[in-house]
């Protein structure tokens, strides 16, 4: 198993390019299952464990794939299996994304109940509700979801989500594009990753109105075609890299981004005293001498993203005063806090809110990753901690960050990846 060994206290300076978004790559790859014609060429796909796992899943279904230099080619003409097995699905919750495309194209699908991140309940009820609205009959037995379209074809319908859900919106979209008639999705997620999926589906021939809004109108078509597509940047990775600059007192430029998609995060960095400069394709952050405590409340886009909440918590350990961290998306997403406190932070959880007292001088020690963003949070803390910090179980980090230690080292960090035995 791998760990990251971080020698802290180094100011980060320089420029780095953002990777493609994992959170948009996965539904886009799933959407290739909607077409049996031609070969897809997908650019700017990050080289991550989750991408590898998802590619294995669609290969199991019969797709043919090739991956090189962040370009993935996919041919789905030979897809025959409609069963997504437990052995693959257990590794990541996003495997549920194959449900909508398989059901739309073939009229049925069987998917193991998913695994994935370790924080709080993340029910798939909204995914199943959307499929039922479109005319699918759902059964759950022996750990598997089986969905069958009545008369073999989904029917357009109105889908009113009670809460915003990126995953359920994506699945509903992919199912609706081949359904007969019109589908209206209200309270749809408006995240940039859903907007990217809409653009990808439209390039394939789907008819979608309302892209980028919370109401999507889809007129079903009979077939879709393979296309070439360039993925969007990873706004969470970009935000994490900017946080690394801020926590170390550095100045970093992140290239290959769309600043508008990080507006809520940049606003909070500015409140914390950072100087932000933007061009159409880059963001530069210069850290202040003293960080100002800044509260955040994580909510669906365009508000502050839940996937930046843990990183912000680490940053606020260095601010002079009290900060309050609230997560309205995943109320229990605080697994990183005990580990931050092991490093010397002073953070209390009160009624689903983290209260951060700073500044605190952090001291390196061994800490344990529990999920993807908690891992990133601990790396940020290690960058500013005195001495050596060892972040264990970085396989969580590898699920969502492409060569993160190489990028940070290029900015002046001192991080090495080493093997270790779990309980030695």
Curated annotation (Swiss-Prot):
The active site is at 117 (proton donor). GO terms for cellular component: cytoplasm. Phosphoenolpyruvate binds at residues 22-23. Keywords: Cell cycle, Cell division, Cell shape, Cell wall biogenesis/degradation, Cytoplasm, Peptidoglycan synthesis, Pyruvate, Transferase. Pathway: Cell wall biogenesis; peptidoglycan biosynthesis. It is found in: Cytoplasm. UDP-N-acetyl-alpha-D-glucosamine binds at residues 93, 122-126, 307, 329. It comes from the Bacteria. Belongs to the EPSP synthase family. MurA subfamily. Cell wall formation. Adds enolpyruvyl to UDP-N-acetylglucosamine. This is UDP-N-acetylglucosamine 1-carboxyvinyltransferase.
């Amino acid at each position: 198993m791998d760990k990251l060994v971080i020698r802290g206290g180094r100011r980060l300076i320089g420029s780095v390019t953002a990777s493609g978004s994992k959170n948009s790559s996965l539904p886009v790859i799933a959407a290739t299952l909607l077409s049996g014609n031609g070969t897809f060429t997908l650019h700017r796909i990050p080289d991550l464990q989750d991408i590898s796992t998802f590619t294995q899943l669609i290969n199991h279904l019969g797709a043919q794939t090739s991956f090189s230099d962040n370009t993935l080619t996919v041919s789905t003409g030979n897809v025959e299996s409609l069963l997504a097995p437990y052995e693959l699905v257990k590794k990541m919750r996003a495997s549920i994304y194959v449900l909508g495309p398989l059901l739309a194209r073939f009229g049925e699908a069987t998917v193991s109940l998913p695994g994935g991140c370790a924080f709080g309940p993340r029910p798939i009820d909204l995914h199943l509700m959307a499929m039922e609205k479109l005319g699918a009959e759902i059964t759950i037995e022996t750990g598997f979801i089986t969905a069958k379209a009545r008369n073999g074809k989904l029917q357009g319908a109105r889908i009113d989500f009670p809460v915003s859900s990126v995953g359920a919106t994506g699945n509903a979209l992919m199912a609706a594009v081949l359904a007969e008639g019109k589908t209206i999705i209200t309270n749809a997620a408006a995240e940039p990753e859903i907007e990217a999926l809409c653009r990808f589906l439209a390039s394939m021939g789907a008819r979608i109105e309302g892209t980028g809004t919370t109401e999507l109108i889809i007129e079903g078509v009979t077939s879709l075609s393979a296309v070439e597509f360039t993925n969007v940047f990873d706004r969470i990775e970009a935000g994490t890299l900017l946080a690394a600059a801020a926590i170390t007192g550095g100045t970093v430029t992140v290239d290959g981004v769309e600043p508008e998609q990080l507006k809520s995060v940049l606003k909070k960095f500015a409140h914390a005293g950072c100087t932000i400069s933007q061009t159409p394709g880059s963001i530069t952050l210069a850290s202040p001498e003293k960080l100002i405590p800044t509260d955040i409340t994580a909510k669906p886009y365009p508000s502050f993203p839940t996937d930046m909440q843990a990183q912000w918590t680490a940053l606020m350990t260095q601010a002079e005063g009290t900060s309050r961290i609230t997560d309205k998306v995943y109320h229990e997403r605080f697994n990183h806090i005990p580990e931050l406190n092991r490093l010397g932070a002073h953070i209390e959880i009160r009624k689903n809110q983290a209260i951060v007292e700073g500044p605190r001088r952090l001291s390196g020690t061994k800490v344990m990753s529990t999920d993807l963003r908690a891992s990133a949070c601990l790396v940020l803390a290690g960058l500013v901690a005195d001495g050596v910090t060892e972040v264990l179980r970085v396989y969580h980090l590898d699920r969502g960050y492409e060569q993160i230690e190489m990028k940070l080292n290029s900015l002046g960090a001192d991080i090495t990846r080493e093997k270790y035995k779990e309980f030695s």
